[in-house]
């Protein structure tokens, strides 16, 4: 697996190569279980901080259909393990034959040590519509999760492009706010 994105700005989470392979298999299995779950309550059992996420999931999926596998997976395209704000994190990008890639982010559960899906990242959940907020509609102040991806543009070690990722449906390529260099 080759990472297209450079995660070096996050501190690495050190695990052995064998542990990383086991974690990759585990994350693939957890992603499959999440996508195959019959309803939101069942899906929440695979979600990090599920008690906080379940009400958000219910609200979100009342307006949007749950993600489903409608194309055959091609397998993992990238996999990285690092630390985010003191939490071990595994980021997995899975390619599909006829549909957009899906990105999964897993955090290690502090209670049982299992790796759980960061649902808010996966669903690109936001409490209000991002476009309305940017256009000045709705609340004057709102809190959003904003994703930033740093992509290596060439073999030159310092040649990067930064993209802020706007909230949107998982796998959508129309999430970029603006490239920043």
Identify the role of each PLM range:
Residues 6-25, 29-32, 36-87, 165-176:
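Short solvent-exposed beta->alpha transition segments
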Residues 78, 93, 130-134:
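Residue-level detector of functional hotspots within protein domains
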Residues 88-90, 114-115:
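Hydrophobic residues embedded in beta-strands of well-ordered beta-sheets
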Residues 90-97:
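Short beta-strand segments that buttress and anchor functional surface loops
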């Amino acid at each position: 697996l080759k990472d297209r994105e450079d995660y070096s700005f996050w501190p690495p989470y050190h695990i052995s190569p064998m542990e990383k392979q086991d974690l990759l298999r585990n994350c693939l299995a957890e992603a499959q279980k999440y996508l195959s779950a019959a309803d939101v309550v069942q899906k929440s059992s695979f979600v990090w901080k599920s008690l906080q996420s379940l009400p958000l999931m219910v609200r979100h999926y009342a307006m949007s259909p749950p993600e489903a596998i409608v194309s055959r997976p091609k397998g993992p395209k990238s996999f990285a393990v690092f630390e985010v704000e003191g939490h071990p994190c595994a980021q997995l990008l899975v390619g599909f034959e006829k549909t957009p890639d899906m990105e999964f982010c897993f955090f290690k559960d502090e209670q049982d040590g299992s790796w759980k899906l960061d649902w808010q990242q996966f669903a690109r959940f936001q409490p209000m519509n991002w476009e309305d907020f940017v256009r000045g509609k709705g609340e004057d102040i709102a809190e959003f999760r904003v994703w930033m991806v740093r992509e290596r543009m060439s073999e030159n070690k310092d040649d990067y492009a930064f993209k802020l990722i706007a909230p949107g449906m998982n796998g959508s390529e129309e999430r970029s706010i603006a490239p920043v260099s």
